[in-house]
A protein has these predicted regions:
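N-terminal export and membrane-targeting signals
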Residues: 1-6
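Compositionally biased, intrinsically disordered low-complexity segments
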Residues: 8-17, 48, 116, 155
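Intrinsic-disorder/low-complexity loop/linker signature
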Residues: 32, 58-60, 144, 187
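Extracellular mucin-like PTS domains
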Residues: 48-67
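Short, surface-exposed polybasic-aromatic patches that bind anionic ligands, especially phosphate groups
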Residues: 65-355
């Protein structure tokens, strides 16, 4: 990921931040009864915290343990978010000979799944976690050189590498604090950029920490989603500069700040990709992990959200070194070979629901 330039320039250009909660599932085109049942039981939560300082009468403690989100049956953002809407019944795919398709499949760099450097640690804070002060070069909606406070487990650590992402869900589970280039540890930390995203929103829009302009946690493969739990959301995918084309498309609101001279491909930031329903996933000779992701790409698709060395998906860091992740990585070239671009994705036809 080459987001540092894009994020910094985005901050300079936008300067400010800126619909409901964790949706258990969304519209699903499949006939899988589990998905249909989940859709009927979509969750809603209360209003988000909007202040820049978190206060509470509940006691804090320094005895903490960082944990990822506990409600693994839930997915962030509104049920009608593009992340959760599912592949539309009217989706129109670009042909296999279309320049965008051939460019998407042409990378000489081996497709990969990122779980270490440049990945996105996602932490669920509790009321017992201490309040941490975070001083940032820029806080969306606040300004430069600002400090904010919120609850963070003291042992929560940012991803290794130059991006240093760290994302923290508030105890109310209504908001995620997303950070870029986090430094330090304990109760006093710094970061380059911080934005608060409403977990009941679409997950897209200006002010996010990813190159496409929206939330960084949208499309993240969580650790249990490779052990048999169905993936009920679209995936986040990054492409190389040789695959990306300058000029982002909906629902992206931005691209890397150097796009005009670094992008030389055919696929715009924000493009929606999927495996057509006509593809027999069972005939692709995939591992269980690869099949899980293939089904997600066929039921929910993927959004182009960032730049990397080649086609790349993202998982929680806890999967690094696991056999599940190794299996998925081995299947990536097969998966990419089945991806096509949905031509009729727009605000009027989210994920191709209207032909």
């Amino acid at each position: 990921m080459l987001a540092p330039v894009g994020v910094v320039l985005l901050v300079i250009a936008i300067g400010t931040a800126e619909d409901s909660g964790w949706a258990q599932a969304a519209r699903d085109p499949s006939t899988d009864q589990r998905y249909a049942t989940a859709l009927k039981t979509a969750k809603r939560v209360g209003k988000p915290t909007t202040t820049t300082t978190t206060t509470t009468t509940q006691p804090a403690t320094t005895t903490t343990q960082a944990t990822v989100i506990e409600s693994y049956d839930a997915v962030p953002f509104a049920a009608d978010s593009p992340w959760n809407s599912g592949l539309g019944a009217g989706a129109l795919f670009r042909s296999t000979s279309d320049p965008m398709t051939t460019n998407l499949r042409s990378s000489t760099w081996t497709p990969w799944v990122n779980a270490g450097q440049y990945s996105h640690p996602l932490i669920q804070a509790s009321w017992s976690d201490p309040v941490v002060s975070m001083t940032c070069d820029y806080i969306s909606g606040v300004g430069a050189g600002a400090t904010t406070q919120f609850r963070v487990p003291l042992n929560a650590t940012a991803a290794p590498g130059t991006d240093g992402h760290l994302h923290v869900i508030n105890p109310e589970r209504t908001q995620v604090v997303e950070m870029f280039q986090v430094r330090g540890s304990g109760s006093q930390r710094t970061c380059n950029y911080l934005v608060r995203n409403d977990l009941r929103s679409s997950g897209f829009g200006a002010g996010g920490t990813r190159a496409h302009g929206g939330s960084a946690i949208g499309g993240l493969i969580r650790s249990n989603e490779l052990d048999g739990t169905p993936i009920r959301h679209a995936l986040a995918v990054a492409l190389s500069a040789g695959q990306l084309k300058q000029g982002f498309v909906w629902p992206a609101t931005a691209e890397d700040g150097d796009a005009q001279w670094s992008y030389y491909g055919a696929v715009p930031m924000g493009s929606y990709l999927a495996i057509p329903l006509s593809v027999d996933v069972g005939a692709l000779n995939l591992t269980p992990e690869g099949r899980a992701v293939a089904l997600a790409l066929q039921r929910y698709g993927a959004y182009v959200v960032d730049r990397a060395s080649g086609v790349m998906l993202y998982t929680e860091p806890s999967l690094e070194g696991s056999s599940e992740l190794d299996n998925l990585r081995r299947d990536m070239r097969t998966l990419v070979g089945q991806l096509r671009i949905v031509a009729n994705n727009s605000p009027q036809s989210v994920n191709g629901w209207n032909p």
